Amino acid sequence: MRVLVSNDDGVDAPGIQILAEALRHGGHEVMVVAPDRDRSGASNSLTLDVPIRTRRIDAQTCAVAGTPTDCVHLALTGMLDCDPDIVVSGINNSANLGDDVIYSGTVSAAMEGRFLGLPAVAVSLVTHNHQAHHYDTAARAAVEIVARLKADPLPADTILNVNVPDLAWSDVLGFEVTRLGNRHRSEPCVPQRDPRGRTVYWIGPAGPEQDAGAGTDFHAVRTGHISITPIHVDLTRYQALETVAGWVGGLTAALDGPA
């Protein structure tokens, strides 16, 4: 298969290099199109107000001065000579569990591939303080999952969000299909003073686990399993439709009232 590989940690990150090599070793034709620097937390942002510069590093690698979504969008809308068959994003050097997927550039790169018609997988290594030890485990998991997708494709609107514990392959207890858990609200922002005495802010840490019981991605990874969560992009809150429908009469009546 022709595999487009991207990430949000940047084209020089070890995770993407190990992933690309593992996929090549697995017999796939791999093209890497990734940000020229760390763009973690970029979510689904596209660059629309300035042109995007690219730089060929070698015949199979291109660095992009843009977001992860930019990278995949460009690659799938004319930048590459040959169309890929699948998008694999990662290996991210930290978890993308629960609510993390909303902010994750890793997941968003996969999501853009899915928007543009390709199967897509996001792969993250659940590290402690970003100290990764077993990218090879996550890469091997990715190769296995790509093979399964080729043999048994999923519905066209499905993205696989994969989180891998930072363990040796022989220590992983298995794969689990999971749902997204969620976290408590984020920790407070962190104010500091710059050298001129002005206040600046750092975004605070993600909140601790909240919904993290059996069946969630949090629980699977915590118990030594590789979590596979099928996700899609329909954000409709179906349980609220009836309540909001009850508002419609009053809202419509307000249109006839005074301006």
From Swiss-Prot:
GO molecular function, a single term: 5'-nucleotidase activity
Protein keywords: Cytoplasm, Hydrolase, Metal-binding, Nucleotide-binding
Superkingdom, taxonomy of origin: Bacteria
Gene3D superfamilies: Survival protein SurE-like phosphatase/nucleotidase (3.40.1210.10)
Binding note for cofactor: Binds 1 divalent metal cation per subunit.
Disulfide links within the chain: none
Enzyme Commission (EC) number: 3.1.3.5
Function: Nucleotidase that shows phosphatase activity on nucleoside 5'-monophosphates.
Name of the protein described by the UniProt record: 5'-nucleotidase SurE
Organism whose genome encodes this protein: Xanthomonas oryzae pv. oryzae (strain KACC10331 / KXO85)
Classification lineage: Bacteria, Pseudomonadati, Pseudomonadota, Gammaproteobacteria, Lysobacterales
